[in-house]
Amino acid sequence: MQKEVKKSWALFLGIGTMMIAHGLQMQIMGIRSVLEDFSVVTIGIFMSGYYVGYFIGSKTTPNLVQKVGHIRVFAAFASLASLSALVAVAYVNPFMWTISRFITGISLVSCYVVSESWLNDRATN
């Protein structure tokens, strides 16, 4: 058991870092949207883009993992998540933020699904 955990430390570190960064991003986007005087409805719409992406990503990721493998899917979606965070910083626009949140939802759930299936593949029992 300890041998398997030692082999997977990079995966745990990567997922932990992404969870911390995402938690900060969610808080900062909410605060920034109020400072930019977005309406409450607009804030609700672009913040819900994350959950729409989360739902779609959970349905599409297993097929991608079967086609190209765990490491490639994880790397691609981790990169996409960081790109969407940069887009949100570069463009202060509710439409772009909705797209950014949607991509973040797809990316993070994909990384979570990949890490879980990766650990299940490594499990011996």
What are the language-model segments listed below?
Residues E4-Y51:
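Helix-loop boundary and gating motifs at the non-cytosolic
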Residues R32-E36, K67, W118-A123:
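Helix-to-coil boundary motifs at intracellular loop junctions of multi-pass secondary transporters
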Residues D37, G69, A90-M96:
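Helix-breaking motifs and short loop linkers at transmembrane-helix boundaries and internal kinks
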Residues G53-G57, S107:
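MFS transmembrane alpha-helix packing/gate-lining sites
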Residues G57-G69:
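Helix-to-loop junctions at the C-terminal end of transmembrane segments
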Residues R72-V87:
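Structural signature of the two symmetry-related core transmembrane helices
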Residues F95-I103:
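Paired small-residue
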Residues F102-N125:
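Cytoplasmic helix-loop-helix junction between adjacent transmembrane helices
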